[in-house]
């Protein structure tokens, strides 16, 4: 399918559960139609990068993406068309906070988007071994949604 198999936590489904969205850290977001397993890559609106997504959640016809692989690090709302097969607009929800040290993994509950502000990616060496002395306590953030 051409989708990065190494990032299994960066996917979400639409409300009808007929479309799966999978983020690839370098390529962007693939939309997979569940009925026929057809894969197509979403085109991003001008002004927003497709790269560096390390968290993805579907909510009210939008994808909320955590982008820790771009500068500035940010949380972006990517608005979908009604068919959920094209990105039509975007809005930066939060960015450039000094507390954002590799934000990752999010969920939406009770009208807020929750995510970790400090995933421990920098605590791993080149061989994938975790240096526990470099791991900070998790910091959970929330953004109130409309």
Model-inferred region functions:
Residues 28-30, 71-75, 122-123, 140:
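Structural signal for beta-propeller blades
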Residues 17, 26-28, 36, 70-72, ...:
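Surface-exposed loop/turn positions within WD40 beta-propeller blades
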Residues 24-25, 68-70, 80, 118-120:
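Short loop/turn segments immediately following the C-termini of beta-strands
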Residues 1-19, 23, 47-67, 98-110:
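Beta-rich, blade/repeat-based domains predominating
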Residues 29-31, 36-54:
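Anionic-ligand binding region
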Residues 33-37, 79-84, 144-146:
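Short loop/turn segments that connect beta-strands within beta-propeller blades
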Residues 118-137:
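Short, conserved, GDST-rich strand-edge loop motifs in beta-rich repeat architectures
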Residues 1-2, 38-46, 88-96:
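A short beta-strand motif characteristic of beta-propeller blades
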